[in-house]
Amino acid sequence: MNKITHRIATVAPGSIAEELELAPGDVILAINDQEIEDIFDYHYLVEDEYLVMLVEKSDGEQWELEIEKDMDEDLGITFENGLMDDYKSCSNKCIFCFIDQMPPGMRDTLYFKDDDSRLSFLQGNYVTLTNMKEKDIDRIIRYRLDPINISVQTTNPELRCMMLHNRFAGEALKKIDTLYEAGIRMNGQIVLCKGVNDGAELERSIRDLMKYLPYMESVSVVPVGLSKFREGLYPLTPFTKEDACEVLDLIHRWQQVCMQEHGTHFIHASDEWYLLAERELPEEENYDGYIQLENGVGMLRLLKEEFTEALESVPGDPELVREISVATGRLAAPFLQQMLELLTEKYPQICVHVYPIRNDFFGEMITVSGLLTGQDLKKQLSVVPLGEKLLLPCNMVRSEEKDFLDDVTVEELEKTLQVRVDIVKSSGTDLLDAIIK
């Protein structure tokens, strides 16, 4: 057991832990004579009404505490390490891995490749199953840690071994069978690579994954991201508009099959495909409740629906004069520009500049807002009118630190551009509020 991962960070006022005189810095060693592997063991063990907890105080003294409480009553403790264990790192060398495409000199945390099923449950991360042992599967089933999000890429075992550069990657697909038989809910992801797992291979994957319905609730298809730092890596090429149209046609055909046979669309294309193909986004009902939102599936449709609904609920103000700017990735900029034109009827004197930012840092093939850097924003926005404030989507910055991928801070950007910078949450309501308030 790593004592560092079991160290208490906070004790809630008025909680059982406070009554027991537990304090930040104390370490939980065991509960009911059982060592704690991670946060799931902890929550499972503290559900009981009667507990015997072994604690090591910050001065090294050990306390044995007998606790009587209501069933499921929380002790009021948080830990310095939210997982209460070391994160499991990825053992693959995927041909599409974006971390392998990053330049040197960035902060260390950006180079860590996690492949931890527990983070799949806690944070929605996608896992390949290649480093998941039998005991990990057993714990997922015992604790009902679902949904589990799986990076499938392909259901062709040989091709999966090649794509993940791991000779066990094909065999790992059998773990999906075990999860399915146990009734564990799952979501899948396919990172599509041109000429590798698209076309007939994509059809095979969709057909195979449909067998896991209803427990496999959805599968997203996202295009591979390619930076300019690919020297020595597997030769991948970007998708064209024509490619995107073919991918969408294939997915739409299978959506019809899934709807007829299972009453769900099941397989979903991320927003990037529609923007690249210059096609209209599907209607809201096609997204099955936005189950794959974190993979960029339906994010723009939801943004527009929320923005439109919020705009309809306000009276408008023809006298409100305002000039502001919005910066975003090149791919979504035309969509955002068109959406913001809806303001004109109720707010005719509000001028919103939408600036598509070219990604010089990672390369022009990267067109999404979440991979833009502070230095690119500084350079490209310093020569255009910004008005009274600049709005940026929240996926550009780390939420707490308020800095970009290259460690430029929001405060630095404000000083360089001499304008107020507001970080806007991802909802359409928040975007409208940031514009009119």
Identify the residue ranges that each predicted region occupies:
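Structural preference for beta-strand elements that scaffold enzyme active sites
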Residues: 147-149, 185-187, 218-220, 266-268, ...
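Flexible glycine/acidic-rich beta-alpha junction loops that bind and position SAM and/or redox cofactors
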Residues: 195-196, 216-242, 261-284, 359-364, ...
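Conserved Radical SAM active-site core
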Residues: 60-62, 69-215, 225-254
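PDZ/PDZ-like groove recognition
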Residues: 1-12
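Conserved PDZ fold ligand-binding element
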Residues: 19-37
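Terminal peptide-recognition signature
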Residues: 17, 25-28, 42, 53, ...
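Short, Lys/Arg- and Gly-enriched loop/turn segments at beta-strand edges
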Residues: 35-42, 61-64
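Radical SAM enzyme core and accessory elements
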Residues: 7, 278-437
